[in-house]
Curated annotation (Swiss-Prot):
It comes from the Bacteria. Keywords: Ribonucleoprotein, Ribosomal protein, RNA-binding, rRNA-binding, tRNA-binding. Disulfide bonds: none annotated. One of its GO terms (biological process) is translation. It comes from Frankia alni (strain DSM 45986 / CECT 9034 / ACN14a). One of the primary rRNA binding proteins, it binds directly to 16S rRNA where it nucleates assembly of the head domain of the 30S subunit. Is located at the subunit interface close to the decoding center, probably blocks exit of the E-site tRNA. The keyword Transcription does not apply. PROSITE patterns: RIBOSOMAL_S7. Part of the 30S ribosomal subunit. Contacts proteins S9 and S11. PANTHER family: RIBOSOMAL PROTEIN S7. This is Small ribosomal subunit protein uS7.
Length: 156
């Protein structure tokens, strides 16, 4: 264990176009091999496409999508006397946002549309409407936590 205490949190830079820290976080999740300008082009294109398709503010669409994908419970493995139990625990706010962004980007990469911009746009629109693979992932996570509720007393 480190003796210095927890590492300091970095100040999140707000996005220059939309003025939102969530857009910056999404750009950083899409980022691959240090190509930030490519990631920004993908995210801005997806948000602009979502604005054209839905007619809503793209940041509102992103927030609604994140709210529909954020998990409140997850399972953690806990070893007790030779057996490993899946123990349901509550997810902290920062982790739930990070997981939601990770799932949205991951499942948009797995979609079948031609460009990443289209894939991300459609996944964001689906997630904001309560559809899509990332929302299903959240439901599966909650279902797993619900089915392992009997082991909740092993929480630490």
């Amino acid at each position: 264990m480190p003796r210095k205490g927890p590492a300091p949190k970095h100040a999140v830079v707000v996005d220059p176009v939309y003025g939102s820290a969530l857009v910056t976080a999404l750009v950083n999740k899409v980022l691959m091999s240090g190509k930030k300008s490519v990631a920004e082009r993908i995210v801005y294109g997806a948000l602009e496409g979502a604005k054209n398709k839905t007619g809503n503010d793209p940041v509102v669409t992103l927030k609604r999508a994140l709210d529909n994908v954020k998990p409140t419970l997850e399972v953690r493995s806990r070893r007790v006397g030779g057996a490993t139990y899946q123990v349901p625990v509550e997810v902290r706010a920062g982790r739930s946002t990070t997981l939601a962004l990770r799932w949205i980007v991951g499942y948009s990469r797995a979609r079948r549309e031609k460009t990443m911009t289209e894939r991300l746009m459609n996944e964001l629109i689906d997630a904001s409407n309560g559809l899509g693979a990332s929302v299903k992932r959240r439901e599966d996570t909650h279902k797993m936590a619900e089915s392992n509720k009997a082991f909740a007393h092993y929480r630490w």
